């Protein structure tokens, strides 16, 4: 046991204080044969920083990264351009923490950006109120289902076949331990499902993703009316938040709760997180909304100020009264989202969405001309589903050998599910060039030849 700042006298004083003769006495319950009493034979010497950097850089060079090769990956995580000013602002010492302001009124800057974040989210989703962010879209969806059960006092959730399977698994895990019924529909690559017959008097909510995992935008108006007629709530899930710059916001189609994955704005792709969840709802439901709500007020002198209006989480109130155990959430990612959205503005956000759609239309038209390839979508935003003449996974692997990230095989998202082996999800964003598209089209032609 070596702790370098301690002298031998310090160690003896500590041992005397706790009443043991030596360090070995602390480990008397550990068999002698299991104790390490000498250096392990055969271990290489440690490396210096330069050597470690060289070793790890060599390992990393074996990877194909979305920024270094033509990439058409999507399925819930998208590569978009993030202005350098976003990261530069995040480096400010006042912001470089995602930790909850336990004395919130002292941190007026933090509360102000959270208020602006909420305003942006409410505007793009077409809703009346939004919270100060969630961990990500998947956990936000699970929280939305729990919120619906509290509001309706029912325990059945219907999940669309177009909902991302990872979101579905998070919802099933969360609701399963509470004894709720989760009616998850089969994957729906052709947008043919009819959810209306599934909505009954026991249904708390229906969860629909738009655009769906397979790229189909959904008109939610009829489904929203059917849900409301049965006393159920409609939860809309958006995994590509840029689509809200072009498509009708779910709130304007009657959705009661809107959950989005906000990674596309301000947050680059990364290996496993963090992301940022957006959560918006109707004002009449605000007291059952999870997380925190930042509000604007005036102080005793009439000056504008910001406060945490609602914090109905178990760290602040009695556990049995809490609507969520959401903790530090994704504050820094929410700030990145806020800065990027402020830089874009409403017109810039819409222009970004139109550019994404135009890129995807161009790519889909070119891929549809490849012999044996079929585009399954009549309409889409920046992602669509291809049906290939052979299983998609080996095709994607062959294209990766050509340094092209062609997309996500649907079979990877639904392992063991029959009938999906030849389907491939392809996404195009503003980062994709004509040369990228040329590489994919020509590469696919060669692999399928």
Curated annotation (Swiss-Prot):
GO MF annotation terms: glycine dehydrogenase (decarboxylating) activity
Keyword Oxidoreductase on entry: yes
EC code: 1.4.4.2
Reactions listed under catalytic activity: N(6)-[(R)-lipoyl]-L-lysyl-[glycine-cleavage complex H protein] + glycine + H(+) = N(6)-[(R)-S(8)-aminomethyldihydrolipoyl]-L-lysyl-[glycine-cleavage complex H protein] + CO2
Assigned keywords, A-Z: Oxidoreductase
A UniProt-annotated Pfam family: GDC-P
Enzyme class: oxidoreductase
Gene3D superfamilies in the record: Aspartate Aminotransferase, domain 1, Type I PLP-dependent aspartate aminotransferase-like (Major domain)
Disulphide connectivity of cysteines: none
Keyword Ribonucleoprotein: no
Gene Ontology terms describing biological process: glycine decarboxylation via glycine cleavage system; nucleoside metabolic process
PANTHER family xrefs: GLYCINE CLEAVAGE SYSTEM P-PROTEIN, GLYCINE DEHYDROGENASE (DECARBOXYLATING)
Role, per record: The glycine cleavage system catalyzes the degradation of glycine. The P protein binds the alpha-amino group of glycine through its pyridoxal phosphate cofactor; CO(2) is released and the remaining methylamine moiety is then transferred to the lipoamide cofactor of the H protein.
Family matches, as NCBIfam families: PRK00451.1 (NF001696)
Complexes and interactors: The glycine cleavage system is composed of four proteins: P, T, L and H. In this organism, the P 'protein' is a heterodimer of two subunits.
Family membership: Belongs to the GcvP family. N-terminal subunit subfamily.
Stated name of the protein: Probable glycine dehydrogenase (decarboxylating) subunit 1
Organism of provenance: Rhodospirillum centenum (strain ATCC 51521 / SW)
Recorded name of the encoding gene: gcvPA
